[in-house]
A protein has these predicted regions:
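Active-site neighborhoods and metal-handling regions in enzymes and metal-associated proteins
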Residues: 1-599
Length: 599
């Protein structure tokens, strides 16, 4: 059977379902480590549905199929599944079922739902089973993705692994392991199977390039009071990395032996397992071992790495300044080439940015694929230009550029929206209101009990006044030399993590009008202790990102005096920090971009 198109792949999947006695098949966006960004080998949802989004699930029955997308991907998903039978489920919209509810609805009485236990989290499987119980439905673990996707499938990654030096990380693997063991003891546990790659990277200072733009290594680590066992493809570990791990008390075993090891473990342990991040196959193996008692708890590594230590913060600040130099040189060249009448495209933007970023000291890789989106393309929050589908830059409207890099000493994420020429009055207002949102959260001061969902409203209020909203969070945490998205804190309507000094967050409100315009302004911010007094402890943000923000689109009279003062003070600081790193011509250009407005 041909497997070149989505309809052909769905037909093959349905035939395999029938042969295996499966009524409904669920494919999550996932790998064995609950990663947000996936190694190409695990992009099964895209292979079978055609949709390239994150945070998604795909469900197939004998007669219908549906894919879930969150607000960042509504426009993109519509475009990518157009012309197929697949229904789009817009997550969070009124009347739209969750994937768990949908599975319960479409499963026949006494039916069987199939899924791969390695790529589905325990939490997802539990949620689905709860919905199936009313119909006496059961879950069958099998791997139809591996059975069917054989031709042209990328191999499972095994890039060279290395250890981030303590001079950048701040603490050694041995020191972090002791801290984890202490936390496990507080939680009444003696062991943990660490499966999330970002948590494991932080714990062991382990890095590789198994995921595009994300310096992580496919691996697990089993931690007890006496042992730390790393499961990794040993061929990828050089002698230096292996010796460093062993010197820090880490044993090394083969990646594929993890389930066999857990099943054979005879030392009694109370094992912490986070259902949200441990895959179902691992969780089931732990549960089936009589020597192990499984305790469901949130992964304690998440808050540990979410608060950056002073060494990490110092390096991150420096990485952001080098990144800012690249951004300044990029914008200057872009403007000069446009002014000279050169025909440029969204792809050109990516090329210019890469040229300047990759020239910076300690550059490793872009922290995600650059989003260079002109005009209406920017309404798709995670749009990516391709050779087959990209826009030319015209001398009007906005160009949105969301980009970042990972360096040996930090990870960056920045968005700027550039005016390329004539703007409509609506475009100017949308830009000005977005800038108000950005400034209001950047200059916020709050008592130290405030969580992300509370601060999120500060950012949205300027848009809410005009009955406008954006269907995504205002900000996310950023790893240190790692994933551009991490937890536990975030700025959105759901996050309950209380902010602490040392946390890093993005500030990226926006306006998105489908097919017309997309505007976003993003800096990274560092949470710090501002003051103590009789009323309590106050916290605030200060910028990590120092790159000029376009002021020509700002509508006079809209920004308050406080907002103008913040913007002008920010631009003074941008110039002071970057000028010594630039040549005379670049400094003159930057001075104009940082000129005060509204005085």
């Amino acid at each position: 059977m041909s497997m070149n198109t989505v309809p052909e792949r769905l037909a093959a999947l349905r035939a395999a379902m029938k042969a295996n006695g499966v009524d409904v098949y669920l494919i999550p966006v996932g790998d064995p480590h609950s990663s947000e960004y996936l190694p190409d080998h695990y992009t099964s949802l895209t292979y079978f549905s055609g949709f390239h989004g994150e945070n998604s699930n795909f469900v197939v029955t004998p007669t219908e199929s549906a894919v879930w997308a969150d607000g960042r991907y509504f426009v993109q998903a519509e475009k990518e599944i157009a012309g197929t039978e697949i229904q789009l489920m817009r997550m969070g919209e009124p009347g739209v079922p969750t994937v768990e509810e949908y599975c319960g609805k479409v499963l026949p009485e006494n039916g069987v739902l199939g899924l791969c236990g390695l790529t589905a989290s325990c939490g997802l499987v539990r949620g689905v089973q709860k919905e199936l119980d009313a119909k006496k439905g059961t879950i069958k673990t099998l791997n139809l993705e591996d059975e069917l996707w054989t031709e042209g499938r990328p191999a499972r990654p095994a890039t060279p692994a290395w250890i981030l030096p303590k001079e950048y990380a701040g603490f050694s693997p041995a020191e972090k392991l002791e801290r984890l063991r202490g936390k496990l003891k507080e939680l009444g546990c003696t062991a943990q199977l660490v499966g999330k790659l970002d948590n494991l990277a932080w714990l062991l200072n382990l890095r590789a390039m198994d995921i595009q733009c994300t310096p992580y290594a496919m691996s697990y680590c089993y931690v007890t009071p006496e042992r730390a066992v790393l499961f990794i493809n040993t061929a990828r570990l050089g002698a230096e990395a292996a010796a460093e791990l062993k010197a820090n008390g880490v044993e090394i075993q083969e990646y594929d032996d993890v389930l066999k090891f857990l099943a054979a473990e005879t030392e009694p342990q109370t094992v912490l397992a986070d259902p949200a991040s441990v895959n179902f196959a691992v969780y089931e193996t732990l549960q089936n071992n009589a020597a192990l008692t499984v305790k469901d708890e949130a992964d304690p590594l998440l808050p540990m790495k979410g608060v950056k230590n002073e060494v990490e913060l110092a390096h991150d600040r420096e990485a952001h300044l080098r990144d800012a130099v690249a951004m300044v040189r990029f914008q200057k060249e872009l403007e000069e080439r446009l002014a000279a009448g050169e025909e440029l495209t969204e792809l050109t933007v990516d090329e210019i940015l890469h040229k300047y970023r990759s020239a910076q000291d300690k550059f490793i890789v872009e922290s995600f694929g650059t989003i260079a989106a002109y005009g209406g393309n920017a309404a798709m929050m995670h749009y990516h230009a391709t050779e087959e589908d990209h826009a030319k830059l015209e001398r009007k409207g906005f160009l949105l550029v969301d980009s970042g890099a990972t360096y040996l000493d930090g990870t960056t994420d920045i968005t700027r929206t550039y005016p390329l020429g004539e703007l409509t009055e609506d475009e100017k207002l949308f830009y000005t209101w977005t800038l108000q949102c950005h400034i209001d959260i950047a200059k916020a001061v709050w008592l130290n009990y405030c969580a992300g969902h509370m601060l999120d409203t500060i950012a949205r209020e300027p848009l809410w006044r005009h009955l406008i909203n954006y269907r995504c969070g205002t900000g996310h945490s950023v790893s240190f030399v790692g994933n551009v998205h991490e937890g536990p804190h975030a700025l959105n309507g759901r996050n309950t993590t209380v902010f602490q000094p040392g946390m890093i967050i993005t500030d990226e409100p926006g306006v998105y009008e489908a097919g017309q315009v997309g505007i976003r302004i993003e800096n990274e911010l560092e949470c710090y202790h501002k003051a103590d007094n009789q009323y309590g402890t106050f916290l605030a943000f200060r910028p990590l990102t120092f790159v000029p923000i376009a002021t020509s689109p700002v509508v006079p009279g809209v920004l308050t005096r406080d907002e103008l003062d913040w913007l002008n003070a920010y631009h003074r600081e941008v110039f002071e920090k970057l000028a010594p790193r630039l040549n005379e011509e670049e400094r003159d250009w930057l001075a104009k971009k940082c000129a005060a407005i509204g005085a």
